[in-house]
Amino acid sequence: MRKIGILVAAIGVGMATSAAVEPRNYYGKIGKRLADSLQKYHVLQQPMDDEISRRAWTNLVTFYDFDHSVFLKSDLDRLAAHELTIDNELGEENISFGYDIYNLYVQRLGERIGFVTNLLAVTKSWDFSTNETYRIRRKDAPWPETKAEAEDCWRKRIKNEVLVARINHDLDKSTNRLDVATDLIKRYRQYMTFMTEPDEEAVLQHYLSAVARAYDPHSDYMSPASKEDFDMEMNLTLCGIGATLTMDDGALKIVEIVPGSPCERDGRLQEGDRIVGVQQDGGPMENVMWQPMKKSIKKIRGKKGTKVILQIIPKADPTGTAKKLIDLVRDEIKLEELAATGHVETVTFDDTTRKLGYIYLPGFYESMGKRPNEEGFRSCSMDIAKCLADLNAQGVEGLVFDLRGDGGGSLREPVLLSALFVQSGPVVQLRDLRMVGSLPIPPGNPIAFRKPMVVLVDHTSASASEILAGHLQDSGRAIIIGDARTHGKGTVQTVMGLGPEKYGSFKVTTARFYRITGLTTQIAGVSPDIHLPSVFDQLDIGEESIPYALPSSRIQAADYRLSWDMHKYVKELRSLSEKRTSADEKFKKHLANVKGMKAIHDREEVSLEYAARKAQMAADREMRELDDEEDEDDEEKTEAKKRRRKRNEPKKNDVVLEESYKVLMDLIRMKGGEEVPEVKGWWY
């Protein structure tokens, strides 16, 4: 019988829970205003009825216990009393259910984590020789009938985590001491802190978001704090100290320091230092150990020009005996890792060398609350126009525009981006509650880039990405390359306030958008001209997999003409690409990786027997490493990934990008130096 010993630290086995969270007295008014506003502005014009109530109830239960392992069946029976009454309760300004379910969740989670800490403290060794399995996907499993049944689920969960740690240790051939129990107790303590210490505003957000998403998955409630985060992401700016943070043993660990930030200019804070206290606005030093990360970060952020004092445990002295205080003046931080970037790539293929442009766009951003002519206004179309000017100056012969992983953003930006490549005509059609109309490229538009281009997409490219890719494809301006289809989001959201600032805002789906052909991207997405799959290609992560997604539809095509003639080259380009990739050993390995990731994603159950699981994990690890860095040790890999993240560069050995460059080279050769012609007039 094979048994594996685990070192156990002397850690307390009890797990205290927080006091019950209660709503503020005006929160009921927020709930009623949201309910009224959703009925008034949502594109479906659906009343707040029993069906919406049922959906909201399901959303909330799923949010708190997605894998059916915290609540008991008896809890669900009790909660079911509200399944068809949420609509009525909101109309009466009653939001107590949102707090009742949260407080019950905290109670049950405390019991589960208490069981985990006790189990880890008393278990001296684990038996991994028995033919036992662990169900890793429980979203369709019945809720446990009894406490004992729930604890058995958690026993298997912990046994699985211990086994995974042990096998990884063995596969790495590590000589380091393995202390799984201590690590897991710390992790679950942090998880308990994260889930059980939100304030009353966060609980309100969870509840009202469940209500909004009952209409469709992209409608949402935003508390004042969430709206602030949303604006920061769209503006690419925040006011703070300029450090990327993560939780580490209860403290905020500095992972990375933003170039040009107060942290970098001051020079005293270093990567690896841990923040354990924050003093702001002349107040007392507040202990932030084991606080939810969002709360601690909110204390560190603040108005530009104000001072914050941090209590630090230096990386050089992790014992904490040499704590020190560091005062910093907050400043505006540019979130450059979210901005568009471009560079020139020199590519040699078939004895021909060409300079090609590459642009990566992680999101469709624009400054919120500012007009384009105001100082400080920034948008992705402005940044990409600068990139294109630079690429043109360097004499590139074509462009790869990378939209992989781009989840969208501003609706206006894909129209302005299309105008950089297409001279005139409609870009996208919108249908709202009143009418169907088009968003066109303004007349007299000068094209910024006239040379051949390909656009890269994947299954996570969504919304504004799909508008841009779909328009460039439909107008014959670009060749689309990537996964079998994009995400499939074809709806437009509008952000509105709910009254006083403390009431927050809501995001509501007010329109659907359609391609100029009349087809929708809703559910269907954008299909590529050349299918080069990523690891996301076969995963169930598209719009159709999200509860309550709106159905697809179509409308009449807009009045448009082709801006160029890319379509006639697709068949030959596809044939050449298929011939290359079918003979390319590296691409064959990549395709095996795609299939392997699908198998891992669909896996419902895993073995808890050591030998069988080790063989499976070794095979999974080998498959995952197929597309990873080559010829780099671990430290070099980490640094390379950091550099790429800062510059938004694609990963090394990106076989899809490599083949896309070759497709672009083929296209340039076929076009024979031809560029997009200038056309006089408004419509083609």
Report each predicted region and the residues it spans.
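Charged, amphipathic alpha-helical regulatory modules used
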Residues: 20-127
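Sec-dependent signal peptide recognition
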Residues: 2-8
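Extended, domain-scale alpha-helical bundle/helix-rich regions
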Residues: 111, 115-240, 249
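Acidic/histidine-rich, surface-exposed loop or edge segments in extracytoplasmic proteins
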Residues: 31-43, 81-85, 186-190, 362-368, ...
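Hydrophobic h-region of N-terminal signal peptides that target proteins for export
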Residues: 10-18
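Conserved functional hotspot residues or short segments at active or partner-binding sites
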Residues: 119, 136, 170-186, 516-684
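Cleft-lining beta-strand/loop regions that shape enzyme active-site pockets
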Residues: 19-22, 36-49, 193-200, 216-240, ...
